[in-house]
Amino acid sequence: MIAAPLDAVAGSKGKKPFYSHLYVQVLVAIAAGILLGHFYPELGTQLKPLGDAFIKLVKMIIAPVIFLTVATGIAGMSDLQKVGRVAGKAMLYFLTFSTLALIIGLIVANVVQPGAGMNIDPASLDPAAVATFAAKAHEQSIVGFLTNIIPTTIVGAFADGDILQVLFFSVLFGIALAMVGEKGEQVVNFLNSLTAPVFKLVAILMKAAPIGAFGAMAFTIGKYGVGSIANLAMLIGTFYITSLLFVFIVLGAVARYNGFSIVALLRYIKEELLLVLGTSSSEAALPGLMNKMEKAGCKRSVVGLVIPTGYSFNLDGTNIYMTLAALFIAQATGIHLSWGDQILLLLVAMLSSKGAAGITGAGFITLAATLSVVPSVPVAGMALILGIDRFMSECRALTNLVGNAVATIVVARWENELDTVQLAAALGGQTGEDTSAAGLQPAE
């Protein structure tokens, strides 16, 4: 194993100093980015390429990670019917909790009413400010989304880094390998061997995470300023608190029912959470999350199917945001929505949140798609939250990430593909600390 000499050296030197852990470095980088962006905003905005470059580095390796994990996982299945079962159970879980997240956002908006009393005239809003997002939303459709899952070419799917297209091909290729049996054994062995250097490459790329988080946070604070939060603090606070309650109460209850602690899980994936906080991109944590879930005892085939699919279909944070933001706009502009209007909003959001998945700025675009179908709420009202959306995107991404981690463990347990002893050891901190960085290796 490549990591053996490194582990031996680490063991001989005793416990690592705290500052050598990735999560500490990312946390310091985020704090430094906030300070620099606040006191030197012009310099902060110029550091955007650092964050963009890191995201591109991670996206570069996502397709190989998904392909190797899914193809080898399915190829090793003795019962191919399991593939359909895992996918079906995952989609059932996604639909249930995505809908629940939408309903919770709707209820909270009605109870708290964060937009009440603003009395903004809809005619005074500038539709040009959100025209780009509205145009992108109109380009999306459910049929277009589903047909786009099928890649035009295999190379094109990998070149574009489209998660669902890569997943689609990987599943088919894994099934084909399983069906040819011994004839495909050499290919499976080769792919298994290729997994080690690919995950080592992920570990190398993760060392740049503090730089990416620093640049992204400096840009955000430098461009939008901490002061821009104050005017709409009620909406931001309501969204953050609702998301926290969803994670600790709803997902916490799911975790407890399935035999693990949500707090222990959050501690286990802390590096990935801080990475998302710094970059505002849940994709940045995808390779590390897949590796962590496999190390936690979830079968590779389950991890490979649930997490990439969940990145498009299990967006709990985005769903809470959509109904909450839609009702905020209605309240701010003095538009009364009947329960019938709100149910229509809920049904449209259930569809549009899937149809616009995987797009940059997906949360804002899916909101535009939803409002364009619901005539009661003006799409131009999105201009009210355009300036603060960037501050809510981190919370959306964090909630989405936790939701997918929980979903993976739950589906693995439903399929009897979860090593509970390994899960307990991982969540108890017995698998080593910095597994998303220097210690990252594919689980056996």
UniProtKB/Swiss-Prot annotation:
This protein's UniProt keywords: Cell inner membrane, Cell membrane, Membrane, Symport, Transmembrane, Transmembrane helix, Transport
Membrane topology designation: Multi-pass membrane protein
Gene3D superfamilies tied to this protein: Sodium:dicarboxylate symporter
Compartments, record wording: Cell inner membrane
Sequence intervals crossing the membrane: 18-40, 53-75, 90-112, 142-159, 163-180, 201-222, 232-254, 327-349, 364-386
Pfam families the record matches: SDF
Family matches, as PANTHER family: AEROBIC C4-DICARBOXYLATE TRANSPORT PROTEIN, PROTON/GLUTAMATE-ASPARTATE SYMPORTER
Name under which the protein is recorded: C4-dicarboxylate transport protein
The keyword Transmembrane helix appears for this protein: yes
Gene name of this polypeptide: dctA
Molecular functions per Gene Ontology: fumarate transmembrane transporter activity; malate:proton symporter activity; succinate transmembrane transporter activity
Annotated function: Responsible for the transport of dicarboxylates such as succinate, fumarate, and malate from the periplasm across the inner membrane. This transport system plays an important role in the energy supply of rhizobium-legume symbionts.
Main location class: membrane
GO cellular component terms, A-Z: plasma membrane
Assigned protein family: Belongs to the dicarboxylate/amino acid:cation symporter (DAACS) (TC 2.A.23) family.
